């Protein structure tokens, strides 16, 4: 038929959708998985011996910045997608803080069309407020209709509770996820570095964990009140993990993301790496890091995302107070999950795969990829 058949032999299939974790063969017919089983053979197929390797569904990163449109000297949809594919990600969701903002259907369509030129699924979240100004709600109906993956003003907190309440009610009615960057500027003297031992040492204002905690508490209660599917983005504070845990027990449809930098690094990284370790919210203390890992262990935190946020070398070469916040992550995320979570025994490989594939897909209303059952996207990663 001219279709390229690939037979992956002896790989450990780890599928968070079905719970299958066993050594099996996988036959790929061009673009889809034809058969999964034992002792498979196929005439003319290219055979890959995957002994000692893992075969899993494509990874899903629901929090990336591809800087496109408007800041493509940092990254663009094509380079971002290449980094994603290299890291094992077959689907990403881009944030809306581009220039112009993705607060209208035209800009959304631009990203979708450029995304189709890549080898992965590039989805785009829409802003909650026009121009990310936090004052006027976007046309959520039109953006949902046009295929927005969800709604978020990521990068900026929504201080206007009335606006957020209306947005949550609309998100609930649309059954669309609403994702929130939680940093109250009242408690942020200088962004990007935790307020504490290191910020004092560097004579830098810093961002207090209270900035996150007060917003997370408010928005967990708004989520409980509205019933909206809400995601607390890139959680960084031990107290915030506990607040989400409590809200889940109360019955809120609230979810939380952790990034590799927040479960691997602490504020000491700023001394070692300078501006490269500057991000919003900042990496904090060892206690915060361990509480984030506990949150991943018990399911309080159910998504692992990169918050892949590239900048130019020139920008990061500026002094700490002037350099932009953000760190890249697509090519290192899986490795850090394996090294920092699975190898020390904090999570099983199955739990890691759920956090990096099934859970983010389901929260963003996609059908999660599976190796062992029929799914529209059965791309596998070795």
Name each region found by the language model.
Residues 51-115:
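Metal-associated gating/positioning segment near the N- to mid-region
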Residues 381:
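Conserved small/polar residues in nucleotide/adenosyl-binding loops
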Residues 113-128:
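A glycine-rich helix N-cap at a beta->alpha junction
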Residues 4-58:
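Histidine-rich, glycine-flanked metal-binding segment
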Residues 65-74, 93-105, 126-137, 152-163, ...:
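Divalent metal-binding segments
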Residues 137-304:
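Histidine/acidic residue-rich metal-binding segments in metalloenzymes
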Residues 201-229, 276, 297, 302-304, ...:
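His/Asp/Glu-enriched, well-ordered alpha-helical/loop segment
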Residues 11, 26, 31, 52, ...:
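Divalent metal-coordination and catalytic microenvironments
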């Amino acid at each position: 038929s001219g279709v390229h058949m690939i037979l992956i032999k002896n790989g450990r299939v780890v599928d968070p959708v079905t719970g299958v974790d066993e050594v099996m063969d996988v036959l790929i017919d061009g673009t889809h998985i034809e058969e999964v089983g034992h002792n498979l053979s196929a005439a003319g197929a290219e055979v890959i011996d995957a002994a000692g390797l893992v075969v899993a569904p494509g990874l899903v990163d629901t929090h990336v910045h591809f800087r496109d449109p408007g800041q493509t000297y940092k990254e663009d949809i094509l380079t971002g997608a290449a980094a994603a594919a290299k890291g094992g990600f077959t689907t990403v969701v881009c944030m809306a803080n581009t220039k112009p903002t993705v607060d209208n259907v035209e800009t959304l369509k631009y990203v979708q069309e450029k995304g189709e030129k890549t080898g992965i699924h590039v989805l785009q979240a829409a802003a909650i407020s026009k121009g990310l100004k936090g004052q006027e709600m976007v046309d959520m109906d039109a953006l949902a209709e046009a295929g927005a993956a969800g709604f978020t003003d990521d990068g900026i907190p929504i201080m206007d509770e009335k606006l957020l309440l209306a947005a949550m009610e609309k998100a609930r009615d649309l059954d669309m996820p609403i994702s929130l960057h939680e940093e109250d500027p009242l408690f942020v003297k200088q962004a990007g570095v935790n307020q504490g031992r290191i910020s004092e040492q560097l004579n830098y204002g810093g961002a207090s964990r209270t900035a996150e905690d007060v917003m997370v508490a408010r928005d967990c209660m708004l989520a409980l009140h509205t019933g909206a599917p809400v995601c607390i983005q890139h959680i960084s504070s031990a107290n915030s993990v506990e607040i989400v845990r409590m809200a889940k027990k109360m019955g809120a449809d609230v979810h939380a993301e952790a990034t590799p930098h927040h479960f691997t690094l602490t504020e000491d990284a700023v001394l070692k790496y300078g501006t490269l370790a500057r991000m919003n919210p900042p990496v904090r203390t060892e206690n915060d890091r361990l509480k984030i890992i506990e949150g991943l262990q018990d399911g309080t935190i159910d998504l692992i995302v990169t918050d892949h946020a590239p900048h130019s070398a020139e920008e990061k070469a500026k002094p700490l107070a002037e350099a932009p916040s953000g760190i890249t992550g697509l090519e290192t995320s899986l490795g850090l999950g394996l090294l920092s979570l699975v190898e020390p025994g904090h999570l099983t490989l199955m739990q890691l795969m759920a956090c990096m594939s099934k859970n983010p897909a389901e929260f963003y209303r996609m059908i999660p990829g599976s190796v062992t059952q029929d799914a529209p996207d059965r791309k596998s990663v070795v």
